[in-house]
Amino acid sequence: MNTKIIVSAFLLAGLLSACEKDTPAVSAAPQETATVEEPAATPLEAETPSRFDIYAEVGLTTDLSHLSDNQRKMIGLLIDAGKITDDIFWQQVWGDKDELLDGIEDTKMRRFAMYNYGPWDRLAADQPFIESYGPRPPGARFYPEDMSKQEFETWQQDGKNEQYSIVKRDSDGGLVLVPYSKAFSSQINAIAELLIEASALADDEEFAAYLKLRAEALKTDNYQASDMAWMDMKNNPIELVIGPIETYQDALFGYRAAFETFVLIKDQAWSERLARFAKYMPELQKGLPVDDAYKAEMPGSDADLNAYDLAYCAGDCNSGSKTIAINLPNDEEVQLAKGTRRLQIKNSMLAKFNQILTPIASELIAEDQRQHITFDAFFGNTMFHEVAHGLGIKTTLDGAGTVRQAMKEHASALEEGKADILGLYMVQKLRENGEITEGELMDNYVTFLAGIFRSIRFGASSAHGRANMIRFNYFSDAGAFTRDPDNGTYRVNVAEFEQAIKDLGNDLLVLQGNGDYDAVAAFVAEKGNVSAQLQADLNRLDAISIPVDIVYQQGKEQLGL
């Protein structure tokens, strides 16, 4: 590689950084089914260096004063483990980090490459921002770059669709599976040692047991026992998510999981506000707006909802758009047995609300409806999005396998869209039952609409971005909102908005349950695009320098450790 990389061209600052893992920062490469109606194949242009400034910096701090000395030491070890997962993630999506960064002389460009974990802009449909690079490989580094879909699909190999291996070529040019535990053996052994060391400092026995099981899972590529233990762990004030978790980065098939780490501190007061909602999961599942066949699976009712402050993140969740809520584990068997844990990341959420969502609403939401933009509604919509991941259908009706496997690269976008819509359905039902009394339902609707504009800016390379493109177009066709041509602001039409929630919820659940890949691809192709009018409105946000997302100043020093 050249020792000096020059800045390539940047498209106009108004280029759609388009339509979030917000739930997990994601980067599936653009498919033919998710398009932006703008010229989109040229590298980004240097005339607008402000493209390098689309992220607002946020310091990750939280109160650790209530933790013991051992717990504070343990956090330091967990951060050390997280740094290693960051190194693995670089290898999964790019390769040699130092070779790339050392060759970039421009300071802002180098920083932008660090934010994106490579030379592709994750919030602009993965366009290259360095002129010597072409398109991002859809399969990242999970597969040989010269491997076609057909070659993989005709390959007779057990376990080829599993999450915890990479595909390489052997000396004869054939395909071979390499488990993560072997592909990244030195890093994984180092992480496991740190987790074992941290377990000795844990005040909570269940957390100590989880750390040991997670260390073993990393070394064996078998995560189910540790996922079960994680769900059984209820009382520890420190939370850790570590390992290969989400499959967004595999845009070729959506099979392979990328490494990441979250270190979080529980907000006990806010968590107590949320605890009562988990028990309603079975009742809400029964009431879903879809035929009974698509809601026959019953989620666990011992799932828990908690609020946290993020202390550190690394790897997948630190790339591109930042996660503000987590719903795990992803293992369908664990979900049915134990439910899921929903982690609301309060400090990240508040930063996005103040720095991004509120300014967007001031520009694009009708003035007389802006009073309905509230943090409680933003928090609630996000929380119930995560809860809604546990609702619906996990296995196709024909029994052929999981929805995730049937939908392939469209699985993430469809699942994120389902969670958004069913989350709003849950808000409706819980308000009707008197379980949610803060604010009013209109707050959730208007804040939800503003949130669509926020998430569309994550781009076609984001599962959340594509999900929001689909929803915007579906809602527009249904008359759920109206755009005022005189001032370019949008207004929620309540009756049509509520009907669109029911209709889209039904459509997404049916698509998932039927497991019809071609039907899903056609649906995403029809709805997953940005019109010229929407693009022009998004350009207005760029013109007044509203950040697209946030980046973290983080680490032990930031936390005072």
Short names for language-model regions:
Residues 37-210:
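N-terminal helix-rich structural modules
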Residues 68, 377-394, 419, 424:
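Active-site recognition of the HExxH zinc-binding catalytic motif
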Residues 15-18:
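C-terminal motif of bacterial Sec signal peptides marking the signal peptidase cleavage site
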Residues 505, 509-561:
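Extended, compositionally biased alpha-helical segments that mediate assembly or anchoring
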Residues 424-522, 526:
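Long, well-structured alpha-helical subdomains associated
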Residues 204, 412-429:
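An active-site-proximal "capping" alpha-helix that borders the catalytic cofactor pocket
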Residues 180-370, 374:
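Contiguous, non-catalytic segments that form substrate-binding/exosite surfaces or channel walls
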Residues 393-417:
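Post-HEXXH active-site segment of zinc metalloproteases
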